[in-house]
Regions:
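PAS-family sensory/regulatory domains
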Residues: 52-66
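Beta-strand residues that line the small-molecule/cofactor-binding core
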Residues: 84, 98-100, 117
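PAS-family sensory modules
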Residues: 1-32, 74, 104, 109, ...
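PAS/PAS-like sensory domains across diverse signaling proteins
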Residues: 32-34, 44
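PAS/Per-ARNT-Sim sensory domains
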Residues: 64-77
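PAS/PAS-like sensory domains
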Residues: 22-23, 78-88
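PAS-family sensory domains
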Residues: 90-96, 109-110
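PAS/PAS-like sensory domain cap-loop motif
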Residues: 42-53
Length: 126
């Protein structure tokens, strides 16, 4: 079986998927929390495409009944104080399966130190 032409000769689909799976998922939001960008690892982790999540707040579709308010408290505090944090959360995949994820949240600012939004780095945990 040959690789699709866009992969090049040195890469196979399995190598690309392995690399995506190993990469942390990244989500970028504007200052109001709406998603403005994701990376391929985010789609791989949770099953959603950018078109499905654009403009939505991550909690609107990733959190559910087993997601505890306790685990979300550090995220809320960091957003309010415009600081960084790390926490572990139970999230929901598009197919509604539950997975545990470590989330690092960081504010991103322009050259004048004006808040532009947040970047979340997510790593799936066993």
């Amino acid at each position: 079986m040959t690789s699709p032409p866009f992969l090049g000769e040195s890469q196979t689909l399995s190598k690309v998927l392995t690399r995506i799976e190993a990469e942390p998922a990244r989500v970028y939001t504007d200052e109001s929390g709406g998603i403005i960008a994701i990376n391929p690892a985010f789609s791989y982790l949770c099953g959603y495409t950018f078109d499905e999540v654009k403009g939505k707040k991550p909690g609107a579709f990733l959190q559910g009944p087993v997601t505890t308010q306790e685990s979300l408290a550090p995220l809320r505090a960091a957003i309010q104080t415009r600081t960084s944090c790390m926490t572990e959360v139970l999230n929901y995949h598009k197919d509604q399966s539950i997975y545990r994820v470590q989330i690092e949240l960081h504010p991103w600012k322009d050259d004048a130190s004006t808040l532009k939004g947040f970047m979340a780095i997510e790593r799936k945990l066993p």
